[in-house]
């Protein structure tokens, strides 16, 4: 995939995303349904002087799950400790993290679906009853130690909710699905980022960037950064529609946010298989990508935008894809 359209964070994104991160719900653009629900749950928990139920945030990468976790902590007025599933390799790692929590704190675990099962099992009692039992020593000299924990809120984030075990999923009192962003919300995000970067965006350039951002704020901010470079070198420093079109064309991002590989998938299906149906394995071989990459990186957006559909027989290209790429659509094919 064109790196600029990759929803996973790149090294350059980390510092930028932290500087752009909203602190409270009233600064957070988009995800209105999720925000409305969480605001109610947080207010109710604070009124009862209880900790907020554990929260699961799930959805595609780049949609602001980490940002939402920090907003939750700020709205609760508590500290947040951040880690990731792959970083918690053994139960002792989890115990060390839990032992540092203060009453009411938020523990944020990104990529929670990647925790080892032995770690996950320790987490069950911590989430449900705020205690853990740990084994010290080995063999005949081993003994179990009961450790009470302060009440806390676990916020877990995942792009693969289906990979969570049923026992773990059942312990989250709140599950929030983060969805792709509407263009109007992405436009506001681009404008907000431009203000922070002190870049002037004019002539509907923000709309154009939003339309090509694959419904993802991370990509919108990344595109703005790159267009800003073009505006600085090839223009007067202002980001207008003309320089935006030119920059994104050079970057191989078309009007619908499709990159070279997206188009290659659709063109291969149209030219070699008359639009399908075609099996995902066969398609992956034809475009020289592995099956998992096609399924995880490309297919969801193509389906979401109405360019591709799944059938029992395989994947099929839609009439919209034909028209977008300039092919004549024959309904009988």
Curated annotation (Swiss-Prot):
Its main location: cytoplasm. It comes from the Bacteria. Residues 1-181 are annotated as: Large ATPase domain (RuvB-L). ATP binds at residues 20-21, 62, 65-67, 128-130, 171, 181, 218. Keywords: ATP-binding, Cytoplasm, DNA damage, DNA recombination, DNA repair, DNA-binding, Hydrolase, Nucleotide-binding. It catalyses: ATP + H2O = ADP + phosphate + H(+). Residues 182-252 are annotated as: Small ATPAse domain (RuvB-S). One of its GO terms (biological process) is DNA repair. One of its GO terms (cellular component) is Holliday junction resolvase complex. It is an enzyme of class 3 (hydrolase). CDD domains: AAA (cd00009). It is found in: Cytoplasm. InterPro entries: AAA+_ATPase (IPR003593), AAA_lid_4 (IPR041445), DNA_helicase_Holl-junc_RuvB (IPR004605), P-loop_NTPase (IPR027417), RuvB-like_N (IPR008824), RuvB_C (IPR008823), WH-like_DNA-bd_sf (IPR036388), WH_DNA-bd_sf (IPR036390). One of its GO terms (molecular function) is ATP binding. Its EC number is 3.6.4.-. DNA binds at residues 291, 310, 315. Mg(2+) binds at residue 66. HAMAP family: DNA_HJ_migration_RuvB. Has 3 domains, the large (RuvB-L) and small ATPase (RuvB-S) domains and the C-terminal head (RuvB-H) domain. The head domain binds DNA, while the ATPase domains jointly bind ATP, ADP or are empty depending on the state of the subunit in the translocation cycle. During a single DNA translocation step the structure of each domain remains the same, but their relative positions change. Homohexamer. Forms an RuvA(8)-RuvB(12)-Holliday junction (HJ) complex. HJ DNA is sandwiched between 2 RuvA tetramers; dsDNA enters through RuvA and exits via RuvB. An RuvB hexamer assembles on each DNA strand where it exits the tetramer. Each RuvB hexamer is contacted by two RuvA subunits (via domain III) on 2 adjacent RuvB subunits; this complex drives branch migration. In the full resolvosome a probable DNA-RuvA(4)-RuvB(12)-RuvC(2) complex forms which resolves the HJ. Belongs to the RuvB family. This is Holliday junction branch migration complex subunit RuvB. It comes from Lactococcus lactis subsp. cremoris (strain SK11).
